[in-house]
Amino acid sequence: MQFNIQEIIKMIPHSYPFLLIDKVIACTPNESTIAVKNVTFNEPFFIGHFPGNPIMPGVLIVEAMAQACMICVISNDQGQNTQDYSVYFMSIELAKFRKPVIPGDTLIIEVNVTHKRNNTCKFQCHAQVENTLVAEAQILAMIKQNEA
């Protein structure tokens, strides 16, 4: 499955300037997702990080991973309303930042469910630019059905 930005906006609660996924190029619900973030000089975080040497903050790369995880577990192919669910992140472990991400880069984020139990999922996440690993992390999340 693939999702464009209009579909993503309907799926997850994030909006500008905190929506960090531009499109999903592959998604197998509850298994894996590959998402894209086109990093431009117009991103608001580049104003202060860092003037004259813009680098995407590592915490925002992890946030992009978390948003891809959210899409992975709330997307479905059965027509259910994805807004019926919320995803809460419980932990981020083994986060490593290997190379800087700069304006003009296309960040490819791949998340894979490595363990699922009841309403929790563990993900292995990788972010690449031009087939080079720039960041990785393990994320643990809880999926909760929203009350009506």
UniProtKB/Swiss-Prot annotation:
Key words, A-Z: Cytoplasm, Lipid A biosynthesis, Lipid biosynthesis, Lipid metabolism, Lyase
One GO MF term attached to the UniProt entry: (3R)-hydroxyacyl-[acyl-carrier-protein] dehydratase activity
A Pfam family recorded for this sequence: FabA
Enzyme Commission number(s): 4.2.1.59
GO cellular component: cytoplasm; membrane
Catalytic activity: a (3R)-hydroxyacyl-[ACP] = a (2E)-enoyl-[ACP] + H2O
GO biological process: fatty acid biosynthetic process; lipid A biosynthetic process
Keyword Membrane in record: no
Domain of life, source organism: Bacteria
Compartment list: Cytoplasm
Top-level EC class as recorded in UniProt: lyase
Alphabetical list of InterPro entries matching this protein: FabA_FabZ, FabZ, HotDog_dom_sf
TM segment ranges: none
Role description: Involved in unsaturated fatty acids biosynthesis. Catalyzes the dehydration of short chain beta-hydroxyacyl-ACPs and long chain saturated and unsaturated beta-hydroxyacyl-ACPs.
Record family assignment: Belongs to the thioester dehydratase family. FabZ subfamily.
Name of the protein in question: 3-hydroxyacyl-[acyl-carrier-protein] dehydratase FabZ
Lineage: Bacteria, Pseudomonadati, Pseudomonadota, Alphaproteobacteria, Rickettsiales
